[in-house]
A protein has these predicted regions:
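Membrane-interacting alpha-helical segments
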Residues: 13, 70, 100-102, 156-167
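Compositionally biased intrinsically disordered low-complexity regions
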Residues: 30-33, 78-81, 164-170
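N-terminal helix-turn-helix DNA-binding core of bacterial DNA-binding proteins
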Residues: 11, 18-21, 25-72, 83, ...
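C-terminal regulatory/oligomerization modules of transcriptional regulators
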Residues: 1-8, 130-170
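Charged, amphipathic alpha-helical coiled-coil/dimerization segments
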Residues: 28, 56, 78-141, 145
Length: 170
């Protein structure tokens, strides 16, 4: 049997989730290559960035702002703290709550990372026009914000009709 070169992906190339995942793989592959010397993953970079821009936020505030589950966030913060990049300080108003700060080493690292993330972003933006980038980011924010739009504006048979009782559609 010969090697098949054309694979029918069916509806996949038209599905937002599929295309987003393919794009994410490209973005993350470049990110991991660029950030390998710093041994940082995207979520860790995000945490350091938010702490740098908002020193003194609590663990819960940073986790919520980034959409990271609390259990995952604690482990990630433990790793950043162990590396000497971030620190927890007990808040004055609530002894059970901890405010987050970068250490001197964390601050120095975030300075080093700025040109790295700019170069990474430039490589990704280089694939599309500036107008396309602005439109893409705007559309992705609409999806991420989770605000439903008017379903009647959608194209396709499912948006224009309602399922009948007993039909296979739900």
């Amino acid at each position: 049997m010969g090697k098949r070169t054309n694979v029918d992906l069916g509806p996949l190339p038209d599905l937002i989730g599929y295309v987003l995942r393919r794009a994410q793989l490209v973005v993350f592959q470049d990110f991991f290559a660029a950030f390998a010397p710093f041994d940082l993953r995207p979520a860790q970079f995000s945490v350091l960035t938010v702490i740098e821009r908002n020193p003194g936020l609590t663990q819960s505030q940073v986790a919520e702002a980034l959409g990271i589950k609390r259990t995952n966030f604690v482990g990630m913060l433990d790793a950043l703290e162990k590396r000497g990049l971030a620190e927890r300080r007990q808040t004055a108003h609530d002894k059970r709550s901890y405010a987050l700060y970068l250490t001197a080493e964390g601050t120095a690292l975030t300075r080093k990372l700025k040109p790295v993330i700019r170069a990474h972003e430039s490589r990704m933006v280089g694939r599309i026009s500036e107008e396309g980038r602005a439109a893409l980011v705007g559309l992705l924010h609409e999806i991420a914000d989770g605000k439903p739009r008017n379903a009647a504006k959608l194209k396709g048979p499912k948006a224009s009709r309602s399922p009948r009782a007993g039909s296979a559609e739900t």
